[in-house]
Amino acid sequence: MLRLEFDGLFRNTDNEHTSAGIMCYGWRILRGKQVVAHGHGTFARGQNANSNIAEYLALVEGLEALLDMGVNHERVLVCGDAKSVISQMQGQASVSSPAVRPLYTRALRLARHFSKLRWQWLPRKHNRGADLLSRHALKHLWHDPDLYQSIIDRLHQAARSGLANRLLDMGGLRVYQSA
């Protein structure tokens, strides 16, 4: 059985109490106790950025990695510490946020490719592997002031162009390891 663990985090980028921000994600895929793939990355958005979107970005990236691995017919357990995301993906809760709905729909479409997929909520302390990856993406930004400033500049440019609601992909990494 494969296990996908995912996590996202959000950081506001300004002092005006808007919802502009940086959303980092991390995910890893395990076969037993062996990590066979992992990834992390960053998106930014000039408005409507939040931690739920970061969680969905992590989920979507992880599901896409599973598809890339061609494991559609294997048993897959998807685990995350965001109760709302797990409940929504299980059909137990609705998605009310228009900002989240497109990512939810995308995650649903990806999940339908797997014939034996189950969902499980994890307490945060049991999702440390994915959490460390999302934090690694954030640390990468903090340690590179030029990169961070370029993100802020792109957010301001998007806002001036009327595209503040667009997700800006600031880069990511996927690593696949042979089992």
Annotate each language-model stretch with its function.
Residues 9-16, 60-135, 140:
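RNase H catalytic domain
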